[in-house]
């Protein structure tokens, strides 16, 4: 069994490895950018490659999971907010894929009181579009699937029950692309 933690990655991601080692973690989760900002961190390709190589060289490997920024709301009825969300998700997924992450954890967002059924198709389509924006969706998902994290169920959150998560996966059309 592996034990891990979400650790601060800094601006180069590389400090996450030392932080994981310092606490004895053998799996790690990091944000690919500030969790409360739209602007993605611009990493040099050499940094992404160095992170991937360092985790591959780690004794036993150091599986990495990334967590998408909290601002993403794939259920937003506001076209501008939805556009920001889909762009941000694609950017987060691209970084996760580049560092060899095993998955990108995502809170799908909130329907803002409109109801889950109202946003279901939009959210499912946005998830598949993000995978396709970063390459062949099946190839990306095999290496780095989107992992929908359940929510506490407050307000209009999407994915607050097993039923909602199941329906979201089914609406996405290919259960190999997206996981919970």
Give each language-model segment a name.
Residues 74-176:
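Active-site acidic/histidine proton-transfer and metal-coordination neighborhood
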């Amino acid at each position: 069994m592996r034990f891990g933690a979400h650790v601060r990655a800094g601006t180069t991601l590389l400090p996450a490895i030392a932080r994981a080692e310092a606490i004895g973690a053998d799996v790690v989760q990091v944000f690919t950018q500030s969790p409360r900002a739209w602007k993605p961190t611009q990493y040099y390709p050499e940094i992404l490659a160095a992170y991937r190589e360092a985790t591959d060289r780690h004794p036993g490997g150091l599986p990495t999971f990334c967590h998408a920024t909290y601002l993403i709301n794939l259920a937003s009825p506001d076209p501008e907010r939805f556009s920001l969300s889909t762009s941000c998700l694609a950017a987060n997924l691209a970084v996760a894929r580049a560092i060899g992450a095993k998955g990108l954890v995502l809170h799908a967002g909130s329907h803002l009181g409109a109801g889950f059924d109202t946003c279901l198709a939009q959210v499912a389509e946005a998830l598949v579009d993000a995978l396709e924006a970063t390459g062949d969706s099946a190839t990306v998902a095999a290496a780095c699937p989107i992992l929908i994290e359940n929510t506490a169920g407050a307000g209009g959150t999407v994915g607050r029950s097993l039923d909602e998560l199941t329906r979201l996966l089914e609406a996405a059309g290919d259960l190999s692309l997206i996981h919970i």
